[in-house]
Amino acid sequence: MTPTIFLVILCLGVASAVIVPEAQLDAELQEQKDKEVLIKAVWSKFMKTNKLHSSENDQETEGSNIEMSASGQLTDEELMKIMTTVLHPMFEEEENKPQPVVDDPEFEDYTESGDGFFVPNQPQ
């Protein structure tokens, strides 16, 4: 077998093994992207309505004020990073605070003075 024939067979084998994109996976990916766009649109509409409602209530003397945090859009990693930066300094402050010194009574050895309590027939 000559090297050219071997090379042709190898090229044909590689060409036949090329991955063909599946239409079903592409459709699922497009559907997922459409859902994300819809979720973002609904979220932005909700936030606009929320801000409008809050601004209307700010003008009145009585009423409820609805506030929504943006943590609903954060991933788990982003939320953990924020919580770590907020809570970690709080716990460090508690650890670094000096503990109050409590006046402990001095240890008294009753065995030497004979003032101890006698317990007869104590099981061992």
UniProtKB/Swiss-Prot annotation:
It comes from Mus musculus (Mouse). GO terms for biological process: JNK cascade. Residues 62-74 have a biased composition (Polar residues). Coiled coil: none annotated. This is Trophoblast-specific protein alpha. Residues 1-18 form the signal peptide. Keywords: Secreted, Signal. Residues 103-112 have a biased composition (Acidic residues). Residues 51-74, 91-124 are annotated as: Disordered. It is found in: Secreted, Extracellular space. The gene is Tpbpa. GO terms for cellular component: extracellular region. It may be a growth factor/hormone, perhaps involved in interaction between the maternal and fetal systems in maintenance of pregnancy. Disulfide bonds: none annotated.
